[in-house]
Amino acid sequence: MKRGEVWWAALPVPIGSGPGLRRPVLVIQANPFNDSRIATVIVAVITSNLALAAAPGNVRLGKAESGLPKPSVVNVSQLVTIDKSLLKSRIRALTAEPMRLVEEGLRLVLAV
């Protein structure tokens, strides 16, 4: 897996407002870590709840951009570290412009 790729993930049963079950995620971890022996990967959760597109830093993706069946939103405030084995199938890699917007959103939410 590479930074900027959208994957289907099999997340555990959700607790509270945490993400769970089968859902798309965006790999945001740097590639040297993705290519290492580290067994985990940092992802941003993707949702079809378009109301979340209004939240600061979140990025709306069209179906063609994401490869998903519905327009979706990368929720930059919902970052999760998961075991790499939970990534089940690669959907596609985002192009430069939506990834640039995601990176801006990550800088905003992480204050870096």
Please identify what each model-predicted range represents.
Residues 1-112:
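Conserved functional hotspots at enzyme active or ligand-binding sites that engage polyanionic ligands
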